[in-house]
């Protein structure tokens, strides 16, 4: 009886402690006089997440409500974690560029011990991120992109052959699916040195596991919220982001590739070759003069994994959305094709590295696509030290507090981009771009922690789109969705329900 009473007292005490902690978290902004919406005890301000609303839609509604409030940031509850939701572009610039040293971390959950694949460059924080970024910085220079360029062109030529075969059978094609297969084959070749054959085989292993890595969730919303709100507790509990099948597949592929290349002394101008080179450097000197060890096998697996996943979905989505808009806007499509004809004439009708770089209007189309269809909805940061917003002493970002910069919402702010739902590549002419601060366009982040692979992603999209526009015309058909319906179940990245069916005709 006494034991039962004692256990009851312990349970009551624990409940009281948990309730107190939760209450303190959920009244964080109220106590500081910062504008915010009252949060749900578990979901915070993420109502409808993965059920009825995308993260983009959640952020857009919140941003629209407060964008005229004159507050540099407002309170937002990412589940139970209080975050500073940035409204003011000058504050975004302070965080991403001017005071970057105080906002280097992202605060995204990873578990290096139980799920080493999650400890990649996109997720890592602190000294680990700085060290790995320094190690990898040489792998994405313009010179290295030039080395990989012929490989991408080779896959693109195979893509054109497949497209001609498809068009001869049926002019109505799901372009979203086809560009996804193209990007899988490009990245599989460049990251793993493997011919994936996704273009011709719908059941190709790399395509299958690429989609599973994006769609399969190891945990439900409750546990996912725990991982975001209480990362240290989640690590103690051994919680992983990736499913066991995903981990096993990528670990096996990378280790087999590394072993084969080292055994047979295979050298290629690709990402995996660069990673192996970093692995075999017992000591390497960083830009700051520091001497460190090369990459471990776990680090190689993690970087190859994120290179594949990030490049696969972002590039294929961008290409698919661009083709959709070009089909709906034939005058823009014609302008891209006319520029392409002029540039190819200057380069002896060859898709050289310099030729692709000269396609300025195509770049504007890609940039406008990334604005209109922002794949990653926000930029995450965490304050290392207490930060008082300049000119607004009431607004303080405390040490350890999360920061959300809502990229997609900023991209649809009519005061920055008039009539934001209209597709206008001219917004990104040199003259128009110069009128906006750099942080008004954030598909790749900004500052020292921007996307390290943006050069590769842009190169892949330019080559794929340029060859498609040269060889085919695209137009809407009865099966073309209008408007596109976005899928709330796609977690973070911008996904759509169904495909993008267009009428495709060979030129």
From Swiss-Prot:
GO function term, MF aspect, one: monooxygenase activity
Gene3D superfamilies, per database record: Cytochrome P450
Recorded GO CC terms: endoplasmic reticulum membrane
Keyword Oxidoreductase in annotation: yes
Record's keyword terms, sorted: Endoplasmic reticulum, Heme, Iron, Membrane, Metal-binding, Microsome, Monooxygenase, Oxidoreductase
Domain of life: Eukaryota
Name of the protein this chain belongs to: Probable cytochrome P450 6a18
Species name: Drosophila melanogaster
Gene: Cyp6a18
């Amino acid at each position: 009886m006494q034991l039962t009473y004692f256990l009851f007292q312990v349970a009551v005490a624990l409940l009281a402690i948990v309730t107190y902690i939760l209450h303190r978290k959920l009244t964080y902004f109220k106590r500081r006089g910062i504008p915010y919406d009252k949060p749900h005890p578990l979901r915070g301000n993420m109502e409808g997440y993965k059920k009825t609303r995308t993260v983009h839609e959640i952020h857009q509604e919140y941003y629209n409500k407060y964008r005229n409030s004159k507050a540099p940031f407002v309170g937002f509850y990412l589940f139970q974690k209080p975050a500073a939701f940035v409204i003011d572009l000058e504050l975004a610039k302070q965080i991403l560029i001017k005071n970057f040293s105080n906002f280097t971390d992202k605060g995204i959950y990873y578990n290096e011990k139980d799920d080493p694949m999650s400890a990649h460059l996109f997720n890592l924080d602190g000294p680990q991120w700085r060290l790995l970024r320094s190690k990898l910085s040489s792998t994405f220079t313009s010179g290295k992109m030039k080395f990989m360029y012929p490989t991408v062109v080779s896959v693109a030529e195979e893509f054109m052959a497949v497209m001609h075969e498809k068009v001869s059978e049926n002019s109505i094609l799901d372009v979203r699916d086809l560009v996804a297969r193209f990007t899988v084959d490009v990245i599989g070749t460049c990251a793993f040195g493997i011919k994936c054959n996704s273009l011709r085989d719908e059941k190709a292993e790399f395509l299958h596991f690429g989609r599973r890595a994006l769609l399969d969730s190891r945990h439900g919303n409750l546990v996912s919220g725990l991982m975001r709100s209480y990362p240290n507790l989640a690590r103690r509990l051994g919680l992983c982001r990736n499913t066991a099948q995903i981990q096993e597949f990528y670990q096996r592929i990378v280790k087999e590739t590394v072993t084969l290349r080292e055994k047979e002394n295979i050298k290629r101008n690709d990402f995996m070759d660069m990673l192996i080179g970093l692995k075999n450097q017992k000591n390497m000197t960083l830009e700051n003069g520091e001497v460190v060890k090369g990459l471990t096998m776990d680090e190689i697996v993690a970087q190859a994994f994120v290179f594949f996943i990030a490049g696969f979905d972002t590039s294929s989505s961008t290409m698919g959305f661009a083709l959709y808009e070009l089909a709906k806007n034939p005058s823009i499509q014609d302008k891209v094709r006319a520029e392409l004809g002029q540039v190819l004439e200057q380069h002896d009708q060859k898709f050289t590295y310099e030729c692709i770089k000269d396609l300025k209007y195509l770049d504007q189309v890609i940039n406008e696509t990334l604005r209109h269809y922002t794949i990653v909805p926000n930029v995450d940061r965490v304050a290392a030290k207490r930060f008082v917003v300049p000119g607004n002493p009431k607004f303080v970002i405390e040490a350890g507090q999360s920061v959300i910069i809502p990229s997609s919402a900023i991209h649809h702010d009519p005061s920055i981009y008039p009539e934001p739902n209209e597709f206008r590549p001219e917004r990104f002419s040199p003259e128009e771009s110069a009128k906006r601060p750099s942080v008004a366009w954030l598909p790749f982040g900004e500052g020292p922690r921007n996307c390290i692979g943006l050069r590769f992603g842009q190169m892949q999209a330019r080559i794929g789109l340029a060859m498609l526009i040269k060889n085919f015309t695209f137009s809407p058909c009865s099966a073309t969705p209008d408007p596109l319906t976005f899928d709330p179940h796609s977690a973070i990245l911008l996904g759509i329900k169904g495909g993008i069916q267009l009428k495709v005709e060979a030129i």
